[in-house]
Amino acid sequence: MEGSGDKRHENLDEDGYNWHAQSVESVSKALGTNPNLGVSDGRSAELLKQHGYNELKGQAGVNPWKILLRQVSNGLTAVLVVAMVVSFAVKDYAEAGVLVIVIAFNTIVGFVQEYRAEKTMDALRKMASPSAKVIRDGSHHRISSRDVVPGDLLTFEVGDVVPADCRLIEVLNLEVDEALLTGEAVPSLKTVQPIGGKDVSIGDRTNMSYSSTTVVKGRGKAIVVSTGMSTEIGKISKAINETKTQSTPMQRKLNLMAYMLLAFALLLALIVFAVNKFNFSTEVVIYAIALSIAIIPEGLIAVITIVQALGVRRMAKQHALVRKLVALESLQAVTNICSDKTGTLTEGKMVVTNVWLPGHESEYIVAGQGYETVGDLSTSAGVAVVRSAALEDVNYRLLVECCALCNTANIVEASEGKVWGDPTEIALQVFAYKMEMGMPILRKHKELVEEFPFSSDTKRMSMVCQTESGNFLEIFTKGSEVVLSICDNVMDRTGDIHSISGDEGFLKLVSTQQEEMAKQGLRVLVLAYGQVSERSIGKPLSKWERNDAEKSLTFLGLVGIRDTPRVESEQSVRNCHRAGITVHMLTGDHKATAMSIAKEVGIIEEPHGSEIANGNEIVPLSASVMTATEFDQLTDEQVDALVDLPLVIARCTPSTKVRMIDALHRRKKFVAMTGDGVNDAPSLKKADVGIAMGAGSDVAKTSSDIVLTDNNFATIVQAIGEGRRIFSNIKKFVLHLLSTNVGQVIVLLIGLAFKDRTGTSVFPLSPVQILFLNLVTGTPPAMALGIEPASSSVMQVPPHVKGLFTVELIMDIFIFGTFIGILALASWVLVIYPFGNSDLATLCNTTANLQECSTIFRARSTVQLSFTWMILFHAYNCRHLRASLLTAEGGGASRFFSNKVLVASVFIGALLPIPTIYIGTLNTEVFKQEGITWEWIIVIVSVFVFFLLSEFYKLLKRRFIKTPYNM
């Protein structure tokens, strides 16, 4: 029989074989295996050669060289490298040395930050089970999971991690936690019968078990159908590796700007040579270098890197770990969040929330979050119920006892997460603890003497208890609606028993209540109770069968269980809406559960209609809630024709999540995806911002841009607010630095007209002065702008999706730069002509000839000081680009000293140029300037005029620009 599957083996993976739809016999035949003996050792060796090891490919560790390459392969760094090479070529070692330091600093900071973030485990490899229990040639073996092959016969028990995708052939109360794949908090109860249909979601393929899922209950035997990259985990891994990382708008704009600056720098150098009739003397070459350097913002990369690094530290304190610096920019542009439900919007823990008892006017509502063993009772109308009073009701007390005793969960410290067992049973036990009737208390008076475990056939579980008196046995039963079929009676509050045999009205009442609770997204359990004696059964307890205990029971009530929303989720969603961000929930849960949670956290209110055109047919759809099957059946054209994309997609698959993100991208939306499971990994990488939960899988973390260490959806809102703050501050210091460059270019371009006796242009600013202004004077205030606190309206305006260089920012750069350049040039002209000797002398670009160059050197000092004080004042201008500096909003008045780093950088920056002007040799030999006296008046007047021009320009902006201010 082994040989019969050889040919079929070659194409099983590629054909997308529907293993869940096949009988055990068909699967065995297709794989050439014996469902009792497994494959032989020889056959397994052949299959290993054919299919390869059961491991995931393409998951190499951190590569420092690739990280380093990313740091130096951006446009701005390329510009700095070109400038450095030219400086070395003309033997201007001071300037070249400064540029080397700047490039090295930028590279080191970026490398260290990204290397730390990327230094994570090889998550996908380590998710695989380290060993597997396999049957080969009829013998049991424990082998490495990487040696498992298609056709192998595996056995599972509680605690095992499934090593490969398998078709189940035997199960005994087998439940598997598939939350990492499906997102469902409730373990999947496994079966062996074939499941028809091609489009059955993973969560509904109950006769399959998948690689990296965990057995939480029972035992099973299965045939391996897929290994390695052919497993569902492997497909996800492949999707992750194939997803290309796109650069952000700011990256693209900065790179474009850098190459434009490089081209412009070469053009300016050409202009210098042309104006000087292509005289390549040292004086002219140095002027060309000065003009080329003037247009390059040497400090920009350093400031961006440092500000982002500070932002990373700040976000880490807020429980958001940034793995990729580009996420800081991406966050501010987010327009849509696609969120997983389990563990993200919800606690990821099953909790009893509703209890319905016959004869009561309303349900009991049970408060409390997660596994906390405290929680108040109230009616559905919100009226508080005293616990002790509720327990006086015999019916309710027995229902609580049933929750505690018909249970195998173990709770040590629920508040610390020390719980073991099936999530549903944990929820029931925690509920009993809330009523101060947990199993440890009840076991003091009642002994568990027999268990009839849950099975897929009976869909119920029963426990038999011996009371202290020993006169009778108590039977506690829980399960699905089938429990009602073995109930002959119902109990009232006083404990009296009433028959319900043939009472169709009562059965309909219970059925209606079950449906209502299910519509709320609850998993509904039926609880029942009975009293018997061994004598009445007619045989000793040790020989009892299930039917001996589970008959003629008394119906106690219904318990509703669900994965409750986090306390902060509703407010977080509301904050997102206020910030212009739409929240979508993509979950593996059923539609009713998904809709209930979405309503509770505020994602949707009531489903509203939408339509799509499909030829001549109008197909009605819900614009709020759809299943993955409904969504996937639509073509891309039909999806794009929807007025609104669904806010909730239930029974969601990994491919559906990616398709949803693609649909949002086609609508020019900027998407963040949150999640914690393996099933979220492809979409986390596909999204513009992938946000993983710290308690989630390593796969999700590896695929993400940001990891939330507190698993708190509210942290996402804080992270987006922080991203907006950082991006706003980047715009502020980009304006500050680039307007300085524009001013310098204006001074040096017009300065070409000032020629000495030999006809050589004399620069108003020397290359060292320019570097001093750009790095020493301009960079500290720019960094201070980078740590400006967020404005109060940062999360009350729509996302900024236009990128860094908006029309307004470009206009501001050139207008403020023109103000600075013209006023600085005016200082140059005033010192030389009206108040100087009007003589530009000779060789004042290269020598320190004080006898002839004194006026030129004094004029340069005046220009440098005017530049210095104007760009320092301009830092305050940049705090708010529309409000007057005289107002608190604009950074003046009460806010003038709020940014202490800015105050210090401005004060120190104003004093730093003074030594370069008055210290001998340093001033004349290095900076090509000298001390001034009366020229200080020109400096002060220049700054005052710049203030007036800035205020007038802002006044015009406030009057004529009506778009929202989001900086």
Curated annotation (Swiss-Prot):
Effect of mutating residue 741 to A: Decreases activity
Topological region Cytoplasmic: 1-70, 114-254, 305-732, 834-900, 953-967
Annotated GO biological process: cellular hyperosmotic salinity response; intracellular calcium ion homeostasis; monoatomic ion transmembrane transport; potassium ion transport; sodium ion export across plasma membrane; sodium ion homeostasis; sodium ion transport
Membrane disposition: Multi-pass membrane protein
Signals that turn on the gene: Induced in presence of sodium ions and high pH, a combination of these conditions has a synergistic effect. It is unclear if potassium ions positively influence the expression level.
Location(s), subcellular: Cell membrane
UniProt cofactor(s): Mg(2+)
Residues binding ATP, per UniProt: 342, 425, 478, 523, 587-589, 651, 657, 679
Domain of life assignment: Eukaryota
Glycosylation-annotated residues: 279
Membrane spanning stretches: 71-91, 93-113, 255-275, 284-304, 733-753, 813-833, 901-921, 932-952
Ranges in the topological domain labelled Extracellular: 92, 276-283, 754-812, 922-931
Binding site for Mg(2+): 340, 342, 676
Pfam families for the chain: Cation_ATPase, Cation_ATPase_C, Cation_ATPase_N, E1-E2_ATPase, Hydrolase
Post-translational modification: The active site is phosphorylated in presence of sodium or potassium and in conditions of higher pH. Not phosphorylated in presence of calcium ions.
SMART domains the UniProt entry points to: Cation_ATPase_N (SM00831)
Record keywords: ATP-binding, Cell membrane, Glycoprotein, Ion transport, Magnesium, Membrane, Metal-binding, Nucleotide-binding, Potassium, Potassium transport, Sodium, Sodium transport, Translocase, Transmembrane, Transmembrane helix, Transport
Main subcellular location of this protein, as a coarse class: membrane
Record's catalysed reaction(s): Na(+)(in) + ATP + H2O = Na(+)(out) + ADP + phosphate + H(+); K(+)(in) + ATP + H2O = K(+)(out) + ADP + phosphate + H(+)
Disruption phenotype: Increases accumulation of intracellular sodium in conditions of high sodium ions. Does not affect intracellular potassium levels in presence of high potassium. Leads to sodium ion sensitivity, the sensitivity to potassium ions is not affected.
Family of this protein: Belongs to the cation transport ATPase (P-type) (TC 3.A.3) family. Type IID subfamily.
PANTHER family found in the cross-reference section: CALCIUM-TRANSPORTING ATPASE
Protein's recorded name: Sodium/potassium exporting P-type ATPase 1
Species of the source: Physcomitrium patens (Spreading-leaved earth moss)
Name of the gene encoding the protein in the UniProt record: ENA1
